[in-house]
């Protein structure tokens, strides 16, 4: 890097900060923060626990946004001042140090941009994920299992926690179906872009002739909704079945019918839960998942109406990403149109860059 390149970088980063400022409007946020702090001083607020919690979440969200913005703004201003002073004093050592720190400065401002992309209505919520294999029997079930492992490894990398709601093992390999909650900061904001059809091309380990196979699996990501969000579900639209736990994920096999399967007849959405020994808790968890899925379905319907996007079956529906392991190794996201060569690392959970690239593409 030379002086010209660094000067251009500072200009570019200043433009990014200005764009973020135009989006978040710090003065308006500071005014709202002052209003919240005044409201918190009113004893009447704490009588309504739900409202108090809602106000508290809003305060935390605004405070975090303002803190990140101020930090990035200060870092950029400091870098600019140090650089101008170093140039005027012909201080090569300081200039070279600033050059070395430039990547970190760029990364911090990129993180600020990303946090703005994760400021949607439900982005701060936990994510409920369902993975279901497409046609192809063992091939599809194994691919669904590979995707589940990918998300588990991603969560381990970034510090998210997972709660399994329902886990149905495949007959020979992989999984028939899995529902789980990902808990952590902006879990839904990051993982919402994973909803869609994932396609795998590889030499099948289940084919003695060593032929190439294509497999599909669907991923549905929905936000874990707060209890105060009302989703109207008519009891007559539900079919509720109780059955014995199958020992999901190596857990206990229950001798009572504590596992719950709920079918929403109008949409044919089926949710299951068997993670608890208590039938009532499993039913409550299943209803939470159903509520989340119906909320997401309604949102998708509105998007499809505005985009006029037709919907198809799992094999040929809305593919979002291709994973090719043979004859070459490549993962390509069909929305950002970016190809990645580290297929094995990606399947081992290294997907943060892919998620961020899609989020950035969706904003452009």
Swiss-Prot record:
Q: Where is the major localization of this protein? A: cytoplasm
Which domain of life does this protein belong to?
Bacteria
Annotated GO molecular function terms are: translation release factor activity, codon specific
Q: Keywords of this protein's UniProt record, alphabetized?
A: Cytoplasm, Methylation, Protein biosynthesis
Subcellular location(s) of the protein? Cytoplasm
One cellular component GO annotation, for this chain's record? cytoplasm
| Residues annotated as transmembrane | none
A Pfam family that this protein carries is PCRF
Q: Which SUPFAM superfamilies match?
A: Release factor
Post-translationally, this protein is described as follows, namely: Methylated by PrmC. Methylation increases the termination efficiency of RF2.
- List-wise, which residues carry N5-methylglutamine? 251
Q: Would you identify the family this protein belongs to, as annotated?
A: Belongs to the prokaryotic/mitochondrial release factor family.
Role noted for this protein: Peptide chain release factor 2 directs the termination of translation in response to the peptide chain termination codons UGA and UAA.
User: In its UniProt entry, what is this protein called?
Assistant: Peptide chain release factor 2
Question: What is the organism field in this record?
Answer: Campylobacter hominis (strain ATCC BAA-381 / DSM 21671 / CCUG 45161 / LMG 19568 / NCTC 13146 / CH001A)
């Amino acid at each position: 890097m030379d002086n010209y390149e660094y000067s251009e970088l500072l200009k570019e980063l200043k433009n990014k900060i200005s764009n973020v400022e135009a989006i978040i409007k710090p003065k308006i946020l500071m005014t709202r923060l002052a209003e919240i702090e005044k409201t918190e001083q009113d004893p009447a607020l704490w009588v309504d626990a739900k409202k108090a919690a809602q106000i508290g979440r809003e305060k935390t969200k605004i405070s975090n946004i303002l803190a990140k913005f101020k930090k990035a703004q200060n870092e950029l201003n400091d870098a600019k001042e140090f650089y101008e002073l170093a140039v005027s004093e012909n201080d090569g050592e300081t200039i070279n140090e600033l050059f070395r720190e430039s990547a970190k400065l760029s990364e911090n401002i990129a993180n600020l941009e990303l946090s703005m992309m994760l400021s949607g209505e439900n982005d701060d919520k936990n994510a409920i994920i369902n993975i279901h294999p497409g046609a192809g029997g063992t091939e599809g079930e194994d691919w669904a299992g590979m995707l589940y492992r990918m998300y588990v490894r991603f969560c381990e990398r970034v510090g998210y926690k997972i709660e399994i709601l329902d886990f149905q093992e495949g007959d020979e390999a992989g999984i028939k179906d899995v529902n789980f909650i990902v808990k952590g900061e902006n879990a839904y904001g990051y993982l919402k872009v994973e909803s869609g059809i994932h396609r795998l091309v590889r030499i099948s380990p289940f084919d003695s002739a060593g032929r190439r196979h294509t497999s599909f699996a669907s991923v549905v990501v929905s936000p874990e909704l707060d209890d105060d969000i009302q989703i109207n579900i008519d009891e007559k639209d539900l079919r509720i079945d109780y059955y014995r736990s199958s020992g999901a994920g190596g857990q206990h096999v229950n001798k009572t019918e504590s596992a719950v399967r709920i079918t929403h007849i109008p949409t044919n959405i089926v949710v299951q839960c068997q993670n608890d020994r208590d039938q009532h808790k499993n039913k409550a968890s299943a209803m939470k998942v159903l509520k989340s899925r119906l909320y997401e379905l309604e949102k998708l319907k509105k998007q499809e109406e505005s985009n006029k996007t037709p919907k198809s079956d799992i094999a040929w529906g809305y593919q979002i990403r291709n994973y090719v392991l043979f004859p070459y190794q490549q993962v390509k996201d069909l929305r950002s149109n970016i190809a990645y060569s580290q297929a094995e690392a990606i399947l081992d959970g290294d997907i943060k860059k892919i998620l961020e690239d899609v989020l950035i593409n969706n904003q452009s």
